[in-house]
Amino acid sequence: MHEANLNARLHDGSTVAVEVRGSGPTVLMAVNPRPVEGPAAEELRRWGTDPALGRNLIDGLADGFRVVAFDYEGHVLQEPKPDTLTPGNLVGDLLAVADAAGAGQFAYYGYSWLAMAGLQLAVRSDRLTALVMGAYPPLDGPYEPMLRVTAATHELAVASASSPPAPRPAAGDDPAGEVDWSTVEVTLTPAQTRQFVTLYQALQGFDDRAAQAQLGCPRLCFVGSADEITYDERWGGVRVSVADPVVRHRVELEALGWQVEVLEGLDHMQATQVLPILRPWLASTLGGSRP
């Protein structure tokens, strides 16, 4: 198996670590290659998330594909880009990762806001061989609600920076995946939160319906049927709907060329069912080997 560890230089001059594993058609994956450990892992489990999800995805694909993995979300939290995380710069960063890996053409997989990044990549570049969007609707995406959530989060981060937050409940107080948003405190810095406000502000004029005509590569979207999040007033008082637009527009999406998968009963944080969907679809689309 071919292996390499690289660095890609991003739009602000910072670098992100890139792990390359396997051989075959190239798949860019915005996932964390390193399993999360310690208290952070327990926090992820509290939210119903596998701390080793990225690693498991890489290992599950590397015997049939050339996987290019990079923890972009972790990077922007370590190296915030409060004024420059625009859609254009985001796409430029993804292309910089592909360039560092020597990938002229490649498939892309992203989950949640990094799936939305993949849609921007597909619209702004002709280098995609396939697009996989997990937990973000290709049509009727929650751009306005997410701006309100990110703006509220930024306000909370600014307030938290000037005064200590109230004690948080113990990690075991809520069942996995059932977090009470009224008790959650912001632990991010103002710079970390402002970058997402910058991103969603720039996306307010984005017409995802018009964008469909610009998509030429094979594409798959999947959501959990329970992926609906209602935030209380502290977080903007909005409902971020991920599953409903996909279910509601399923026939239209399929007519537009999307393969659509709805995972019954799963919510936004439960991404462990990705591999059984992702690998067969990539193999049939790109020609990578099956297990």
Where are these regions (language model features)?
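Active-site nucleophile elbow and catalytic-triad environment of alpha/beta-hydrolase enzymes
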Residues: 138, 193-211, 243-247
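Conserved loop-alpha-helix segment in the C-terminal half of the alpha/beta-hydrolase fold
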Residues: 225-262
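Catalytic active-site module of serine/aspartate enzymes centered on a nucleophile-bearing elbow/loop
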Residues: 247, 254-291
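Conserved alpha/beta-hydrolase
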Residues: 48-77
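Flexible "cap/lid" loop of the alpha/beta hydrolase fold
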Residues: 116-123, 127, 131-160
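Short beta-strand element of the alpha/beta-hydrolase
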Residues: 25-42
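Conserved acidic catalytic loop of the alpha/beta-hydrolase fold
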Residues: 88-106
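Short beta-strand/loop motif that positions the catalytic acidic residue
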Residues: 215, 221-223
